[in-house]
């Protein structure tokens, strides 16, 4: 008994510390931001962090949400599917009930189950694979970007109606995102009676694509669409140019990385890429663009504005119904939001009812122009 009495002050002190910690935690609303911070796709994570942090800082400067500041929790997922569940679990363990979640589709497809099971409201500003929301039809998970079954047909329509090639090759990286969007393009081209002479996967990480380039030459294609990320496309562009294959290349938003010019060199000139429309030009976004620039962040990229919009939607929803994730998710499913990407409405699966893609052209210096 004396031993227990000696512990009582310690126990009381520990209890006081725990209560103080809980009180401190309750002073903020945590938002997990799991993104690629390492690996070859860090630029996508940088863009999403830039958008999310700018929105958080803007909202906090105006007093936060219901008197509480938003607290960003930065987590690295490496754009690696094997890191998906560990990264999502770090969001859970941080105490965050909300997340601006994951740039890469392969990661998101695996991680979305964690958010659904734990009741965490997640919004991805970057993952376009239909599998994200088709696999389990989540209630707690949403997007602020379109799907590949929107992006793929959009690209195919541009190819068929504007570029009008004689023969097309559709290549992909055999991964969730790349093969998915490539299949969407192939199927949409077939519906428009465009001749897809070659549909084939390449291996991620290979350094020599001479074999597939030889096949492209033999097939006599005049346009190559590649589904995947920039490292492989960069090598395909450079090696095709070096081996005398001068055809039009096109890809999805996952290829639109400034590191592409360092890999492809001058062969990047003329590359076409589908990306979200330039939301910096939307009427009413002048103050958002200024907030980016005041924070010395670039608003001009594929994912900055979708990430900014994700935070806006979370903040507006919490302000309306409180911090209960179930109520926030219910509110998001039935509400129209005014955001940095325009009006946002969700369907039953958390997909956007409308999203605008556009085609951009790259010059030899890696600068892009919306067509």
Residue ranges: model-predicted function:
Residues 2-15, 25-371:
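Extracytosolic ligand-binding ectodomains
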Residues 20-22:
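N-terminal signal peptide c-region/cleavage motif recognized by signal peptidases
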